[in-house]
Curated annotation (Swiss-Prot):
GO terms for molecular function: small ribosomal subunit rRNA binding; structural constituent of ribosome. GO terms for biological process: translation. NCBIfam families: S20. Residues 1-25 are annotated as: Disordered. Binds directly to 16S ribosomal RNA. Pfam families: Ribosomal_S20p. Keywords: Ribonucleoprotein, Ribosomal protein, RNA-binding, rRNA-binding. It comes from Nocardia farcinica (strain IFM 10152). This is Small ribosomal subunit protein bS20.
């Protein structure tokens, strides 16, 4: 445990950020999983809706700094490729 006052605050701040980032990443994984399930089922309408939702989640995660913008772009590209194969 830190003895310095500013470091104690950083520990609390980092913990709050970690929980927030964890929540965003979890929601992101859920959105991607729901798209993949719709795509595997062959439901094009539902897959299109979930692709849009997953893309929005990826963009938000990238803008918040939870994931790198290039990672978001790569994942969106892979999801779009999977959608176009339907």
């Amino acid at each position: 445990m830190a003895n310095i006052k500013s470091q104690m605050k950083r520990i609390r701040t980092n913990e709050a950020a970690r929980k927030r980032n964890q929540s965003v990443k979890s929601a992101l994984r859920t959105a991607i999983r729901s798209f993949r399930e719709a795509a595997e089922a062959g439901d094009k309408d539902k897959a299109a809706e979930r692709l849009q939702f997953a893309s929005r989640k990826l963009d938000k995660a990238a803008s918040k700094g939870v994931i790198h913008p290039n990672q978001a772009a790569n994942k969106k590209s892979a999801l779009a490729l999977a959608f176009n194969k339907l």
